[in-house]
Swiss-Prot record:
Compartment(s) where it occurs, according to its Swiss-Prot or TrEMBL record: Cytoplasm
Residue ranges of coiled coil: none
Chain's gene name: pgi
EC number from the UniProt entry: 5.3.1.9
Record protein name field: Glucose-6-phosphate isomerase
Protein source organism: Rubrobacter xylanophilus (strain DSM 9941 / JCM 11954 / NBRC 16129 / PRD-1)
Major subcellular location class: cytoplasm
MF annotations from Gene Ontology: carbohydrate derivative binding; glucose-6-phosphate isomerase activity; monosaccharide binding
Length: 432
């Protein structure tokens, strides 16, 4: 059973917080939005219960692992990379690639079109044991295809065409696109990105499931947590906490002028979750002059860089803390320097205890300063809890789209830059 709770009390009880009447007034719109999600579910709502994607991903992952792969390079950008990176960073050992007994290949993410990073990946992989997974629905994403062509060239040079082709996976649209044509031409292993699922909503498709399974993560539990979120939405409707959160964040923006939403995660392992959510919220809602600006932060690190602004800067933010109650591992603080009052008091505590105390201290300080804040609590950092949370945040984003009156599934604002890039790089049919 997933253990994820949403605490919105400090959006209601602080000075300038929301009122019960405001939530009552918006409730008909919430019910309508949830009704649409459940009656005509978008693609991401169906993923947790789609066995075929899970089974296909597990089958390919087993091929990779049984082949004795030393390296697995995941090539993608945006949601095609951020989602898989969340799963790996949150659920794997923090230094997974350095472990001598990982039980699986090293994972590398070729995301940005950065020559230094790409060259670095080529420096450390062992071509004879490397598998590549290239992820793009269209096969025309410039950054992804450029990275793929470079890695393909290096592997083909080292292994020959047959060797490269035998260790390349294509995750793309099942029917169309340039990458689909390449896969058919070279008889590459293929996984499907459902046509109705956009990249930023694709983490529970083969986009996220394959690299997670390659790393030995419990993808069954991940999907079970997400499915539980959908079940609770069906049971609770507009009272589901993810839906209530959509209303609160929308109202904080529309009626209070708090148009910056900070997700502050109190676990290094969740740093990529904040980055993933920034894309999800920004790209889904930032349209027609609407939408609030998401920002990621990590506690306690950013207490020493950003908290000053949150405490005493402009009243334009809502801080959302993500807290993990039980850490996968904890470390006791040994006794030393007992005569120094500024040091000795730490003895006998644990580092996890310090992290949780500072999390609560930040929440109390923000509330005391009249700064609205919310908390998402995970009982532990498990695959089931993470699946629930990511599904809930996707639901929240979709409902917020209805409240803002925008389509949360398109991204017209990024097309102009793509067209200019295509023209300047010489793609036929495009002019600068």
């Amino acid at each position: 059973m997933a253990d994820v709770t949403f605490d919105y009390r400090n959006l209601l009880e602080v000075e300038g917080g929301l009122t019960g009447r405001e939530l009552e007034e918006i409730s008909p719109r919430l019910r309508a939005a949830v009704g649409t999600l459940l009656e005509d579910p978008p693609g991401f709502m169906r993923l947790p219960r789609t066995r075929e994607h899970l089974e296909a991903s597990l089958e390919v992952a087993e091929r990779v692992r049984s082949d004795g792969a030393t390296d697995f390079v995941h090539v993608g950008i945006g949601g095609s990379a951020l989602g898989p990176m969340v799963l790996h960073r949150a659920l794997s050992h923090p230094f997974y690639n350095l472990l001598p007994d990982r039980g699986g290949p090293r994972l590398h993410f070729a995301e940005n079109a950065d020559p230094a990073t790409l060259s670095g990946i080529l420096d450390v992989i062992e071509p004879e044991g490397t598998w590549v997974n290239v992820v793009t629905k269209s096969g025309s994403t410039a950054e992804t295809m450029a990275n793929f062509l470079v890695i393909r060239g290096a592997l083909a040079e080292a292994l020959g065409d047959f060797g490269y082709q035998a260790r390349t996976v294509v995750t793309t649209d099942p029917e169309k696109g340039f990458l689909k044509r390449i896969a058919d031409r070279e008889d590459l292993v293929t996984l499907q990105v459902p046509p109705e699922v956009g990249g930023r909503f694709s983490v529970l498709s083969p986009v996220g499931l394959l690299p997670a399974a390659v790393a030995g993560l419990d993808v069954e539990a991940l999907l079970a947590g997400a499915a539980r979120c959908v079940e609770e939405l069906e049971e609770q409707g507009a009272e589901h906490p993810a839906v209530v959160g959509a209303a609160m964040h929308h109202l904080m923006d529309a009626s209070r002028g708090r148009n910056i939403r900070v997700m502050m995660v109190y676990a290094d392992a969740l740093e990529r979750l904040a980055a993933w959510f920034v894309q999800l919220w920004a790209e889904s809602l930032g349209k027609d002059g609407k939408g609030s600006t998401p920002h990621g932060a990590v506690g306690t690190t950013d207490q020493h860089s950003q908290l000053q602004l949150y405490m005493e800067g402009p009243q334009d933010k809502v801080i959302e803390i993500v807290e993990v109650r039980e850490h996968p591992r904890d470390v006791g603080i040994p006794g030393a320097y007992e005569d120094l009052e500024g040091v000795g008091y730490l003895s006998g505590h644990t580092v996890g205890e310090l992290l949780n105390v500072e999390c609560d201290a930040t929440r109390r300080a923000l509330t005391g300063a009249g700064r609205p804040n919310a908390t998402i609590r995970l009982g532990s950092l498990s695959a089931e809890n993470l699946g629930y949370l990511m599904q809930a945040l996707e639901v929240q984003t979709a409902v917020a789209g209805a409240l803002y009156g925008v389509n949360p599934y398109d991204q017209p604002g990024v097309e102009a830059g793509k067209r200019i890039t295509y023209a300047r790089m010489g793609r036929p049919g495009y002019r600068a």
